């Protein structure tokens, strides 16, 4: 099985359940004003009293990954540290696993041709057997097969991701120029992740691997992570930020739109890393790939 370069099929999840109010005023102007500064602290869940804040250190290479608000008093978005490898992988892994039922069941609503095919199979079963009982069992069997193949493909995708960029985050994202990886820290725990990777050929930055721990959703953490990628792109003079996602939940798409992204189109023929493209897989597993773009400045 071949594993190509990582694609954003997430994010974000896929997994974002944040509040989705739009940025006030002109989005781009507000972002440009804030480009050199930390976004304001986000509200945190009640917790024990925090230790005194650490002393300020030198600015890391990402440009916006410096010291944030003290732990326990807000969410701090900062650059990834090597010791957080397993925590970041866990958040990514758990977020991707949520796609299995979402793709199998919710995702079916995005594919009317597949729904029609399944209805024809049920009708054919009744025409052949004349049994209402067997005909009623057909939808349950089809959904069971969708779950099986969704699980099979998504676990294969996870295997690819965990052995490519997510195998060594520091090497893949922190060392190459134009790339970075951030974590959201709340009360000393890593609760969210996001990555950025530059495409020098068209002077854009791709937002990747956005995911938030399910226990900490609803705190605008995903929005803060997305803003950090926008800051990074502006500070390094990239012209646009792009992302691709196979998210089924409407909440994820509303999140991207609240950050200022425009929906550029969708495709039903996207091949997820790890797919074998067998006939059964094509019949019981489908994803819709959405492309988003936020233009920061004209070239």
Swiss-Prot record:
Catalytic activity, as annotated: L-aspartate + acetyl-CoA = N-acetyl-L-aspartate + CoA + H(+)
A single GO molecular function term of this UniProt record: L-aspartate N-acetyltransferase activity
TM stretches of this protein: 118-138
Tissue and organ distribution: Expressed in brain, kidney, liver and spleen. In brain, present in neurons but not in astrocytes (at protein level). Expressed in brain, thymus and spleen.
GO cellular component: endoplasmic reticulum membrane; mitochondrial matrix; mitochondrial membrane; mitochondrion
Chain positions covered by the region annotation Disordered: 44-70
Gene Ontology biological-process entries: acetate metabolic process; aspartate metabolic process; positive regulation of dopamine uptake involved in synaptic transmission
Keywords tagged on the record: Acyltransferase, Cytoplasm, Endoplasmic reticulum, Membrane, Microsome, Mitochondrion, Transferase, Transmembrane, Transmembrane helix
Free-text activity regulation comment from the record: Aminooxyacetic acid (AOAA) blocks its activity in both cytoplasm and mitochondria.
Cellular location(s): Cytoplasm; Microsome membrane; Mitochondrion membrane; Endoplasmic reticulum membrane
UniProt cross-references to PROSITE patterns, sorted A to Z: GNAT
Sequence ranges of Gly residues compositional bias: 60-70
Signal peptide: none
Top-rank EC class of the record's enzyme: transferase
CDD domains: NAT_SF
N-acetyltransferase domain boundaries: 143-280
Record Gene3D superfamilies: 3.40.630.30
Domain of life, per lineage: Eukaryota
Inducing stimuli: By methamphetamine in brain, via dopamine receptor activation (at protein level).
Topological relation to the membrane, as annotated: Single-pass membrane protein
Additional comment: Seems to modulate behavioral effects induced by methamphetamine in vivo.
Family affiliation: Belongs to the NAT8 family.
Function per UniProt: Catalyzes the synthesis of N-acetylaspartate acid (NAA) from L-aspartate and acetyl-CoA. Promotes dopamine uptake by regulating TNF-alpha expression. Attenuates methamphetamine-induced inhibition of dopamine uptake.
Listed name of the protein: N-acetylaspartate synthetase
